[in-house]
Curated annotation (Swiss-Prot):
A Gene Ontology molecular function term of the record: 5'-flap endonuclease activity
Membrane-spanning intervals of the chain: none
Composition-biased stretches (Basic residues): 160-169, 182-195, 453-469
Record's keyword annotation contains Acyltransferase: no
Protein name as it appears in the record: Structure-specific endonuclease subunit SLX4
Organism field: Phaeosphaeria nodorum (strain SN15 / ATCC MYA-4574 / FGSC 10173)
Keywords linked to the UniProt accession: DNA damage, DNA recombination, DNA repair, Nucleus, Phosphoprotein
GO BP annotation list: DNA recombination; DNA repair; DNA replication
A Pfam family: Slx4
Region (Disordered): 1-35, 54-119, 147-318, 339-399, 416-471, 577-748, 765-799
Protein purpose: Regulatory subunit of the SLX1-SLX4 structure-specific endonuclease that resolves DNA secondary structures generated during DNA repair and recombination. Has endonuclease activity towards branched DNA substrates, introducing single-strand cuts in duplex DNA close to junctions with ss-DNA.
Post-translational modification as stated in the protein's UniProt record: Phosphorylated in response to DNA damage.
Length: 946
């Protein structure tokens, strides 16, 4: 049989490559293989150096074949554990000594049989060792056959020291059958058996596969069976020929590939699904599709996703939401139960199964509905007006719901499902599709019905979406809209108000309540005006008027009309008065009637008295005036108009007719008496003196010129002087010259002014009407400054007093401080500056004009002006020299000397002119721009701006 190992040398290299891949898998399982590699590496060096040469001399050809068939798994496990890495070296020696190793291997089998019980503890160590060994065993399979004989004896010693005890147990398992096949076993099967023992799962798998291997072969070695069972082709080759089967066994990486087929153990389920791979791809596609739920156009979208999309559409239509949401819950539950029945080993596969179950039924519906859903999103964009109009649509929609089997919809949603009903009505082509929609919403309906109903419902929903876009159905037909317009009122308001969730009826009720309240307010304010606005069209107008009423209650129509009516005739009367005035100026005869209407009542008695005699009328007027003084209420009204009437009846020129002057003097007397009666009681003493008409007449002429005197002095003394003037006045009356006054055209006012000019003193003292020119000429200018009230009065010094002596005054001590004086000085400065007249020379503006033009005021100049033009002064304590000099001057005059008691609160002080810093404080208080003189003060002009 040496020929077989020779040709077998070429294959072991390839199985080594395969085993190298297997070693990589072994390294993944546990950290034990590296430990086993180290221990076995030392054993391999010893075994290859000693035992391979000895056992190679023995005849192993026939025995190798038998051992390879029967006991190869156990022996290979022992030898492979001892020779994981050095197996490559042994490959060369095994070719030379093909038959030397079979004898020592049966020795190892005997201890193996004894130690099988202990294998339970050691298998974990054996497994990692076996995992590493197959790499080397596969490469030098023929070499490992020979050297394994003698080193087996040494192997147990090494195993006692370390983990290589596992190969000893394997040798004992072999018993005493045949030692030759052990090296064959070490090449391939041992590492896999060790791998199976290294992990609990690998051990179990090795046991299961060993049973299969025993079925195929009688050897019963579990380690080799686990590896060979994974690849049945390798086991058949091992059965055919010892060495050839061993070379095939090293292709253990293929069983590792079986681990991939171990995933197919759920192959029955996968076979049922068949499309798992394609579905997994679709499933990979689904997550982005899920994110794209709002877009219903995609046909490849996951079927569950499309179920969600119709729900989104229904979210727009409210009814569709409830229907599809209810349908979704059912397929989700059914899908979960179906997934449980499928019993997929992997959770991911279960999800795929669920998707598969749901997808096929929904795919057809989703594909059919997806283009229609494209119409639905067009409906989704709603304007605020659409939202506002939906309130009106709810009523029409409710009627539609009752028409289209609203029982089911009422169970899920009441009012929100209106658009669905509206959509279902227009779809006369597919009325059969709508009942399955209802069935789909109903839970007892089968899944197939649900799928079909979903597809139909989606189509119906898309159709409904397109028609509500037209709004014709939602807002009813134009005829029905007109009918409703006639039946119900239209609400007008902002979109935000109309878009509220509140029903339109509530808004209408509020509007009616407001209108009623406004009508009640109108009735309460104006009972007569309220009823007309009750007309339908006028009600709205009244509402607007009521708004104005709310803003101003008195501005209502009635009130405004009354005010306007009163105001318009007043304009007419005012226009009449100037015409009457003009008529009096133009024609004195035309003027009196207007005044006669007012004055005829009182003027009659004075006319009668004047007819009796010239003297009595003035007396009567005078007595009437004095009586009026007794009764102040009549003084202002009666006698004044009587005198005016007398003047109107006799309008001679003031210069020619003395009677006119006398009559006007009577008017003045009336005025003077009225003033005196209001201010002074002595006029009441006059009536008894004037009780006699004759005496009164004699006093009457006297009183005219003397009335001014009476106003100024006592009224009773100058009676004699009044009489001659009165007689003159009568003489003047005898010569009438009425045409002169109208020729002047000045009217009564000019005559009055002329009369006032004749009596300057009386007019100045009594009447406010004298020409102001005379007053200004005679009057003196008012003082521009106010003297401080706290200033002590200066004793009048005679001219003999020397002007050089500074006057001394007694003032309160507090006035020495500027803070106490500025409150009185500042107003004086302000009043003086404002009283300055404007200058005619623009190059020399006044101080007030400079201040108004924001010209900087030089403090020194302004202070000098105030000190020169005003008497504003401050106080300074007087020195003893000044006080003595002043007292001496007072003695020379004969005046009393000045003295102050210490601690009495008064001080002898001397006047002091205002200082620049004090004026500066006034400028600052008045926000006046001021500066210090250049080169003076606090650093010059630039630093002094304020």
């Amino acid at each position: 049989m040496p020929a077989s190992p020779l040709p077998a040398l070429s294959p072991p290299a390839s199985p080594r490559r395969n085993t190298s891949g297997a070693s990589a898998l072994g390294s993944r399982k546990a950290d034990i293989p590296p430990d086993a590699i180290r221990g076995f590496a030392t054993v391999g060096s010893l075994v290859r150096s000693e035992h391979f040469a000895q056992h190679f001399d023995d005849d192993i050809a026939g025995k190798d074949q038998e051992q390879s068939r029967k006991k190869s798994p156990e022996d290979v496990g022992n030898i492979a554990a001892t020779k994981k890495k050095p197996g490559k070296r042994a490959a060369t020696t095994s070719t030379a000594d093909g038959e030397a190793k079979p004898k020592p291997k049966p020795r190892a089998r005997k201890p193996k049989a004894a130690d099988e019980e202990a294998v339970i503890i050691d298998p974990e160590l054996r497994l990692p060792a076996a995992k590493v060994s197959p790499f080397f065993a596969a490469e030098g399979a023929p070499a490992a056959i020979e050297p394994s004989d003698e080193p087996v004896v040494d192997v147990p010693k090494l195993t006692k020291a370390g983990k290589p005890r596992k190969p000893r147990a394997k040798k004992e398992n072999v018993g005493g059958e045949e030692a030759v096949p052990k090296p064959k076993r070490t090449r391939v099967t041992k590492p896999k058996a060790a791998k199976a023992k290294a992990g609990g799962k690998s051990q179990e798998e090795a046991c299961v596969e060993s049973a299969h291997f025993r079925k195929s072969e009688d050897t019963g070695d579990e380690t080799v069976a686990g590896v060979l069972a994974t690849r049945k082709s390798a086991t058949t080759e091992n059965v055919g020929s010892g060495e050839a089967s061993i070379w095939d066994v090293p292709q253990s990486p293929k069983p590792k590939k079986k681990r991939a087929p171990k995933k197919p153990p759920p192959d029955p389920v996968i076979n049922n699904l068949e499309l798992d791979e394609a579905v997994s791809r679709r499933r990979d596609w689904t997550p982005p599709r899920d994110t794209a739920i709002p877009s219903p156009f995609t046909d490849s979208v996951g079927k569950e996703n499309k179920q969600i999309e119709p729900d989104a559409d229904n979210g727009g239509f409210t009814h569709m939401i409830s229907n599809f949401a209810y349908a979704q819950a059912l397929p989700a539950q059914v899908a979960s139960t179906v997934a449980d029945s499928a019993t997929g080993t992997m959770a991911a596969t279960k999800r795929r199964r669920i998707e598969l179950l749901d997808v096929p039924g929904n795919q057809t519906t989703s594909r059919n509905s997806s283009p229609e859903k494209g119409k639905a999103p067009k409906k989704k964009p709603r304007t605020i007006t659409d939202i506002a109009t939906e309130q009106y649509q709810h009523r029409a929609a409710q009627l539609d719901q009752s028409d289209v089997a609203s029982d089911f919809f009422q169970s899920h949603t009441a009012v929100t499902k209106v658009p669905l009903n509206d959509a279902s009505l227009p779809n006369g082509d597919a009325p059969t599709k709508k009942p399955p929609r209802k069935r789909s919403t109903s839970k007892p309906a089968s899944e197939k019905e649900k799928v079909g109903s979903k597809a139909r419902s989606k189509k119906a929903s898309t159709k409904a979406a397109a028609k509500p876009k037209h709004i014709a159905e939602k807002l009813l037909s134009p005829g029905s809209a007109l009918m409703r317009m006639n039946k119900q009122d239209i609400l007008f308001g902002t979109s935000s108000q109309l878009a509220l969730e509140e029903p339109p009826t509530l808004v209408r009720q509020l509007q009616h309540a407001l209108k009623e309240s406004e009508v009640e307010a109108d009735l309460s304010s104006n009972g007569m005006i309220a009823p007309p606005p009750r007309w339908p069209k006028l009600d709205k107008v009244v509402g607007k008027r009521s708004l104005w009423d709310a803003s101003s209650r008195d501005v209502e129509g009635g009130m405004l009309e009354h005010m306007e009516d009163v105001y318009i005739p007043e304009f007419d009367r005012t226009q009449d008065f100037p015409l009457l005035m003009d008529g009096t100026n133009d024609q004195p005869d035309g003027a009196p009637p207007s005044f006669a209407d007012i004055d005829d009542f009182e003027p009659a008695p004075p006319v009668i008295i004047s007819s009796d005699g010239p003297t009595p009328p003035p007396t009567t007027s005078r007595t009437s005036q004095r009586k009026a003084n007794d009764e102040p209420d009549h003084v202002m009204e009666g006698p004044v108009f009587e005198d005016i009437d007398d003047f109107d009846f006799q309008p001679p020129p003031s210069n020619q007719n003395v009677e006119f002057q006398d009559s006007f003097a009577d008017d003045d007397e009336i005025l003077h008496t009225s003033v005196q009666s209001s201010t002074h009681p002595p006029p009441r003493l006059r009536p008894p003196a004037t009780s006699d008409p004759m005496n009164g007449s004699s006093k009457k002429p006297r009183g005219c010129p003397a009335k001014s005197q009476s106003a100024i002095a006592t009224s009773g003394s100058p009676a004699v002087a009044k009489e001659p003037k009165r007689t003159k006045g009568k003489e003047v009356k005898s010569a009438p010259a009425p045409p002169t006054t109208p020729a002047k055209g000045s009217g009564r006012f000019i005559d009055i002014d002329e009369i006032l000019d004749s009596d300057d003193e009386a007019l100045q003292a009594l009447s406010p009407t004298p020409p102001r020119i005379h007053n200004f000429e005679n009057s003196q200018p008012l003082p521009l400054y106010s003297v401080s009230p706290t200033r002590a009065k200066k004793p009048k010094a005679d001219s003999s007093v020397d002007s050089k002596i500074v006057p001394v005054h007694i003032i309160p001590t507090a006035h020495l401080e500027w803070l106490n004086l500025k409150n009185s000085i500042f107003p004086s400065i302000t009043s003086h500056i404002r009283s300055l007249p404007s200058t005619r020379d623009p190059s020399k503006p006044s101080w007030h004009e400079k201040i108004l033009m924001y010209d900087p005021i030089v403090l020194e100049d302004f202070t000098a002006y105030l000190n020169a033009k005003t008497s504003l002064r401050t106080w300074r304590r007087a020195t003893k020299i000044q006080s003595k000099a002043w007292n001496k001057a007072q003695k020379s005059i004969g005046a009393q000397e000045i003295g102050v008691v210490e601690g009495g609160g008064n001080v002898l002080a001397v006047e002091k002119e205002l200082e620049a810093w004090q004026v500066q404080s006034w400028c600052e208080s008045m926000s006046v721009c001021c500066i210090w003189g250049e080169g003076r003060g606090k650093g010059g002009v630039r630093k002094g701006f304020y």
